[in-house]
């Protein structure tokens, strides 16, 4: 036998060598071996032709498998015929087995130092049986996918091997035995909770999920919205929360109607300064609400500052061709603002916000017109004096173009800086002159008593349902109407007769005897047919128990006492 190296890999050859080293060299005597010895003696004395035929039959009877038939026949046809024991079978396997491992690739069949934790189990299993040794020495993660142990879960082992091949570029792991066991444990835990990553060749694009379409965040739009919301004063934000409030004319969306020039760093700084002056307006208004002259003066200063900022933004544009579209856009915006101002003045003139508001609005419009005229005068002055100089010409053309929006800016600031209305004024202003929501007039309600449903008719419908139930077949609507008419006539006559009878006899409470006497006069109750018999004929037991305490029918009593 070959020398046995205990640290070699667990290949079929090494496993068989270990079994041969640890097994007993002498096979125990069994009854089957006695028969085998007799056959061997018979084979030695037989002719060569008979010998070949009997060896074939014995090999077929012993093998019971397609793989070992040729090997056993070949071994027995050789010169020395040995008994078919496990030891001889293992020797034959060692003679015919290849040097390379069947279960593992060539790259894995290398001497790997075994950990110390596995050595005691090997020593114990050497004294024991083969079944206890093979599962411990078998590496779970390096098995080929097609040759798995029968007691293992195929899906988990396949996925672990596949994931290991994907992680290492389709090359199996060359880690030690202990690390392989630990990695297999962690990967089995990972496989229970997550799906392994599949390579590009295995993925099918038709079955893959589409990634969710997420819109990219537009930082520019976010900053623009933030700037628009920061421009609105807090009093306007609070006014928008009032019920049925009118939309403000100077809301931040008005800024988008003016033509915008491309911004630069200096223009942004000037616009920020203009916004600071604009936001300082509500503070002025809160500090001195009762001083209209100071309020108007502060407002005029803010308007001039904003106009200067607007002039600085438009000063970057040079030439008459670039001023003309700006001038046209400003004229269109001025027309729109004038129309809105006319509508606002009409609403104020109707008395929706009180005469004091009308006077205040007129004062503001006069101030804005005066400021506009001053702006035009100032614009004409520098334009005439500095005709030769280049820089003065550039400054004069935006001033002449922005003389008209000065009044617009004044009106806009006037609307932003208007004092917050008192609670009474807010209630008055909540009633719009032009109704936005059309309110329908309430329906006239009748104050009289509700028409009650006739209980007589309700009772008739109940009896009609009973009639259709006892008919035990579908009935047409006309037949049900006829039944209802007959029942109506019958109950009407019965009620009239009962009323006349009770009034004639002076009864305050109608008793069953009175009803029986009335029905006898009507011919329904006779000497042959009593009231109880009539009730038994036409009413079931449940209704009879409610109407009468006891009913006699022959020798039986209903209900049973």
From Swiss-Prot:
Q: Which GO terms describe its cellular component?
A: chromosome, centromeric region; cytosol; inner kinetochore; kinetochore; nuclear body; nucleoplasm; nucleus
UniProt feature, compositional bias: Basic and acidic residues: 18-27, 357-367
Q: Is the keyword Phosphoprotein in the record?
A: yes
Residues bearing Phosphothreonine are 85
Compositional bias segments (type: Polar residues)? 276-288
Q: How is it modified after translation?
A: Dynamically phosphorylated at Ser-47 and probably also other sites during the cell cycle. Phosphorylated at Ser-47 during G2 phase, metaphase and anaphase, but not during telophase or G1 phase.
SUPFAM superfamilies assigned: Histone-fold
Q: Which GO terms describe its molecular function?
A: DNA binding; protein heterodimerization activity
Q: Where is this region: Disordered?
A: 1-83, 256-292, 333-457
UniProt xrefs under Gene3D superfamilies: Histone, subunit A
Which residues are connected by disulfide bridges in this protein?
none
Post-translational modification Phosphoserine, affected residues: 47, 343, 345, 356, 373, 385-386, 397
Recite the UniProt keywords alphabetically: Cell cycle, Cell division, Centromere, Chromosome, DNA-binding, Dwarfism, Kinetochore, Mitosis, Nucleus, Phosphoprotein
Give the Low complexity compositional bias ranges. 34-46, 395-407
Pfam families attached to this UniProt entry: CENP-T_C, CENP-T_N
Subunit composition?
Component of the CENPA-CAD complex, composed of CENPI, CENPK, CENPL, CENPO, CENPP, CENPQ, CENPR and CENPS. The CENPA-CAD complex is probably recruited on centromeres by the CENPA-NAC complex, at least composed of CENPA, CENPC, CENPH, CENPM, CENPN, CENPT and CENPU. Identified in a centromeric complex containing histones H2A, H2B, H3 and H4, and at least CENPA, CENPB, CENPC, CENPT, CENPN, HJURP, SUPT16H, SSRP1 and RSF1. Interacts (via N-terminus) with the NDC80 complex.
* Record text about domains: The largest part of the sequence forms an elongated and flexible stalk structure that is connected to a C-terminal globular domain with a histone-type fold.
User: Which protein family is it in?
Assistant: Belongs to the CENP-T/CNN1 family.
Illness: Short stature and microcephaly with genital anomalies: An autosomal recessive disease characterized by growth failure resulting in severe short stature, severe microcephaly, and delayed and dissociated bone age. Additional features include global psychomotor developmental delay, pubertal delay and genital anomalies.
Function recorded in the entry = Component of the CENPA-NAC (nucleosome-associated) complex, a complex that plays a central role in assembly of kinetochore proteins, mitotic progression and chromosome segregation. The CENPA-NAC complex recruits the CENPA-CAD (nucleosome distal) complex and may be involved in incorporation of newly synthesized CENPA into centromeres. Part of a nucleosome-associated complex that binds specifically to histone H3-containing nucleosomes at the centromere, as opposed to nucleosomes containing CENPA.
Q: Know the name of this protein?
A: Centromere protein T
Which source organism? Homo sapiens (Human)
From the UniProt record, report the name of the gene that encodes this protein.
CENPT
